[in-house]
């Protein structure tokens, strides 16, 4: 049995995505085309417990439709170590929640490819 390819996206609320300017939907559509299953979560959905980094994720299907651009298939608790890639898409306010998410994700950074790694944004904040 082939292991499924999972792209986990950490982003802002789905309701706040502007499909005219935000490339998150485009990236998710391309990942789907390449056979990835998309799991989406917000920074506050992350947890680190008993050595595991998990997130309360939405299993999503994305569409090209700008008005209804996603469908929630299910909600699940997901061990992020099982993701092939974690894509960081949210813009920080540089607050405690953001800092917590950077520290949590650092625990799996050597085992999961993290694109736009949080610690690089924390350590080299350009604002």
Language-model-detected regions and their locations in the chain:
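Extreme N-terminal starter segment of soluble prokaryotic enzymes
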Residues: 3-8
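Extended, domain-scale alpha-helical bundle/helix-rich regions
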Residues: 11-12
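Conserved N-proximal alpha/beta basic substrate-recognition cap immediately N-terminal to
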Residues: 15-127
């Amino acid at each position: 049995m082939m292991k499924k390819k999972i792209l986990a996206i950490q982003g802002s609320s789905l309701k706040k995505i502007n499909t005219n300017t935000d490339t998150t939907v485009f990236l998710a559509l391309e990942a789907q085309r390449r056979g990835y299953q998309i799991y989406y979560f917000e920074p506050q959905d992350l947890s680190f417990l008993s050595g595991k980094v998990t997130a309360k994720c939405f299993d999503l299907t994305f569409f090209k439709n700008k008005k209804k651009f996603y469908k929630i298939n299910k909600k699940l608790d997901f061990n992020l170590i099982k993701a092939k890639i974690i894509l960081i898409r949210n813009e920080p306010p540089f607050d405690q929640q953001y800092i917590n998410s950077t520290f949590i994700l650092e625990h799996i950074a050597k085992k999961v490819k993290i694109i736009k790694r949080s610690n690089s944004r924390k350590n080299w904040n350009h604002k």
